[in-house]
Amino acid sequence: MAPELIQIDLEPRKPAPKPSWLRAKAPMGENYHDLKKLARGMNLHTVCESAQCPNIGECWNHKTATFMLLGNLCTRRCGFCAVPKGRPEPIDFDEPRRVAEAVATLGLNFAVVTSVNRDDDNVGAAQVFAQTIEQIREQKPGCRVEVLIPDFQGNDESLRIVLAAKPEILNHNTETVPRLYRAVRSGARYERTLNLLRRAKEINPAQVTKTGVMVGLGETTEELLHVYRDLARQNVDILTIGQYLRPSKDHAPMTRYYTPEEFLFMKEEAMKMGFRHVESGPLVRSSYHAHEQANSTKQPLVTI
């Protein structure tokens, strides 16, 4: 019998003790410190640090990092996100070169690149993504690239600019169920997210697409399964499902911890819907095991 996922309201309450399956190792090790020093020295930002990712120690010690473009100040105030908010600096068009140099210095064969939202200049933001892909391929031939993009406020030109650079994987996160969008995803729209994922396939049917959903914000089983079906209808290839962890008391409250068995149930249900790969677990984040996810789709390297 499938485990019952219980709906709990969004009222703040004293959090339950963190279960053992959510206790990640403290970040340490030579590779961790080397990557941190490199990012500082090249004036680069990583979402691993800005979003307080629990997997930072594991990933950085394997020389895997998700570089964050367009500065470290986001123009939106999403209730779940730990990335700082504010008025950003002008777009830095030298950033793609520095990210590519870091990728080459680290000897990465798979790079993940994301960004803050830049609602002040969606086309400029897309150009930085495209230039970063191109610079990485120039400075580290053979390196595959995954991009985790914002919704560009539905701007089709921006999406086309990124797709023209032919990333191996195009990721745009759904984050939560439609009912919780207003409280959790400031400035975003559920239908806009579905449209972006659908348009990516319409523009380039061969493009591998990916999206992620958090659980623990007050959603129900039925709502989650409805979202997975919606995403499958957009021909999304890869789905990630992970536990929401509240960054601070100023962020959206977490309603409960999901068990490993519940994550397995969600993976099994989603796989029945036609996804090529589903990564589902308490510590799963968008870029966690991204290289392995890419391999599972059997997607050959895109050449340009």
From Swiss-Prot:
Binds 2 [4Fe-4S] clusters per subunit. One cluster is coordinated with 3 cysteines and an exchangeable S-adenosyl-L-methionine. Its EC number is 2.8.1.8. Pathway: Protein modification; protein lipoylation via endogenous pathway; protein N(6)-(lipoyl)lysine from octanoyl-[acyl-carrier-protein]: step 2/2. It catalyses: [[Fe-S] cluster scaffold protein carrying a second [4Fe-4S](2+) cluster] + N(6)-octanoyl-L-lysyl-[protein] + 2 oxidized [2Fe-2S]-[ferredoxin] + 2 S-adenosyl-L-methionine + 4 H(+) = [[Fe-S] cluster scaffold protein] + N(6)-[(R)-dihydrolipoyl]-L-lysyl-[protein] + 4 Fe(3+) + 2 hydrogen sulfide + 2 5'-deoxyadenosine + 2 L-methionine + 2 reduced [2Fe-2S]-[ferredoxin]. Its cofactor is [4Fe-4S] cluster. SMART domains: Elp3 (SM00729). GO terms for cellular component: cytoplasm. It holds the Pfam family Radical_SAM. Residues 60-276 form the Radical SAM core domain. Belongs to the radical SAM superfamily. Lipoyl synthase family. This is Lipoyl synthase. It comes from Koribacter versatilis (strain Ellin345).
